[in-house]
């Protein structure tokens, strides 16, 4: 069994003609120290926001030790002063505003070589999208040191939130939820799912005559009806090429899983159980699915092959495992740890290997109610909802670095999300 543990960053980077900063990282088994400064400019408000977001992104990456250098009025870089403080990299930013557009400029300096590495501009045509300027800056700084990719930072999160009784709206947001934009409203709109990696269209369920799965192009506004079902109609997963969907439908009784081909419109039933089968996810090169079922009398995690055959119980731990996500080779599930009839219960997240014969299991959370785990598109990060002591937050787990980060949910009641 392959162990997922803490990664020794950058030690396996293969370079020819490696520069001084990367040489230090390689030889001393440490991650680089970076100072982030804002150059004095007229747009202090947005400059401060981008600076704060960039520093946070660098920390979340797990690839830097970050110092916030605040405002610098001196355009000359005092390399020796930074070197004396054991600083490896310096990032200086400034932000300019034109009408409703923002442009952020970053100058990255390698203190060990006393050289400016690059100057890059990043423009967003909506000032509310300033977080993405910071996210893109961070991705490029991360690429410079050739650390593992953090491209997931610039992906959009799509989420549904309850507004009033019987109503919910769908929003798109950055991973910190700092940027938010409503894209669907009016009625009950739930279970949003990205159509593909381009993030131009979404699937979601809308209550019409019956719950109905819709495909909504966010650019053109075009809406297409796919499938309706009396009790439940949800897109649980999308194949990598976007052609096949796993649907949770209940046309006659309780929920079963179906495979839907978006080109042929063919709908094939995968499970035929008298109870509840939901939350199916593609695994093992999309030859199998993992899903939640109550066929043992309580919710648990099972697997089955798409070409037929019986179901296999995957999780032997716990008696209430109610949600699952997978990157194909590993899965993360939600498990109820307590059974308080009248009080709050604890739900934790667990990571398991899907390799045949593996018994690897690792707890990812320790307290509170941790639910709705979702893997990032690169399979290295988990997003989830955390409720603890009357507070709620969107959580990020960097699996290889054993770190958690939280973004408070203020006046938000999230129904479901995808990223």
From Swiss-Prot:
Q: What is its main location?
A: periplasm
Q: Where in the cell is it found?
A: Periplasm
Protein's UniProt keywords contain Cytoplasm? no
Q: Which UniProt keywords apply?
A: Cell cycle, Cell division, Periplasm, Signal
Q: Set out the biological process GO terms recorded for this chain's protein.
A: cell division; protein import
Which GO CC terms are listed, alphabetically?
A: periplasmic space
Database matches in SUPFAM superfamilies: TolB, N-terminal domain, Tricorn protease N-terminal domain
InterPro entries xref list: 6-blade_b-propeller_TolB-like, Tol-Pal_TolB, TolB_N
Q: What does this protein do?
A: Part of the Tol-Pal system, which plays a role in outer membrane invagination during cell division and is important for maintaining outer membrane integrity.
Q: How does it assemble?
A: The Tol-Pal system is composed of five core proteins: the inner membrane proteins TolA, TolQ and TolR, the periplasmic protein TolB and the outer membrane protein Pal. They form a network linking the inner and outer membranes and the peptidoglycan layer.
Q: Which family does it belong to?
A: Belongs to the TolB family.
The cross-references to PANTHER family, in alphabetical order and at most eight, read: PROTEIN TOLB, PROTEIN TOLB HOMOLOG
UniProt-recorded name of the protein: Tol-Pal system protein TolB
Which species expresses this protein natively? Helicobacter hepaticus (strain ATCC 51449 / 3B1)
């Amino acid at each position: 069994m392959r162990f997922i543990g803490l990664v020794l960053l950058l030690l396996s980077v293969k370079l020819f003609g490696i520069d001084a900063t990367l040489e230090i990282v390689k030889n001393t088994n440490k991650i680089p120290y970076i100072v982030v400064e804002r150059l004095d400019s007229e747009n202090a408000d947005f400059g401060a926001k981008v600076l704060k977001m960039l520093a946070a992104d660098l920390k979340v990456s797990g690839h830097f030790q970050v110092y916030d250098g605040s405002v610098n009025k001196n355009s000359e870089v005092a390399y020796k002063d930074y070197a004396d403080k054991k600083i490896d990299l310096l990032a200086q930013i400034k932000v300019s505003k034109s009408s409703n557009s923002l442009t952020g400029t970053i100058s990255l300096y390698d203190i060990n070589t006393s050289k400016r590495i690059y100057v890059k501009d990043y423009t967003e045509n909506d000032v509310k999208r300033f977080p993405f300027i910071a996210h893109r800056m961070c991705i490029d700084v991360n690429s410079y040191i050739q650390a593992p990719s953090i491209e997931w930072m610039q992906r959009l999160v799509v989420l549904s939130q309850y507004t009033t009784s019987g109503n919910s709206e769908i929003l798109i947001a950055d991973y910190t939820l700092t940027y938010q934009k409503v894209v669907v409203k009016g009625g009950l709109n739930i279970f949003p799912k990205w159509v593909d990696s381009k993030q131009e269209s979404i699937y979601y369920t809308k209550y019409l005559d019956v719950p109905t799965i819709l495909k909504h192009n966010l650019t053109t506004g075009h809406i297409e009806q796919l499938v309706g079902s009396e009790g439940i109609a949800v897109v649980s997963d999308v194949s990598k090429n976007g052609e096949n969907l796993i649907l949770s439908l209940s046309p006659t009784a309780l929920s079963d899983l179906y495979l839907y081909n978006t080109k042929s419109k063919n709908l094939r039933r995968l499970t035929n159980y008298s109870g509840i089968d939901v939350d199916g996810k593609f695994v093992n090169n999309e030859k199998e699915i993992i899903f939640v079922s109550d066929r043992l009398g309580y919710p648990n995690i099972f697997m089955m092959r798409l070409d037929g055959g019986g179901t296999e119980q995957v999780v032997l731990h716990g008696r209430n495992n109610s949600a699952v996500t997978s990157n194909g080779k590993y899965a993360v599930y939600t498990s109820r740890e307590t059974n308080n009839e009248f009080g709050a219960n604890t739900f934790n997240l667990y990571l398991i290997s899907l390799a045949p014969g593996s018994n690897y299991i690792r707890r990812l959370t320790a307290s509170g109610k941790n639910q709705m785990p979702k893997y990032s598109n690169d399979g290295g990060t988990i997003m989830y909802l955390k409720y603890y002591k009357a507070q709620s937050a969107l959580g990020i787990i960097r699996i290889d670095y054993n770190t958690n980060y939280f973004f408070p949910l203020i006046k938000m009641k999230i129904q479901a999300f995808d990223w």
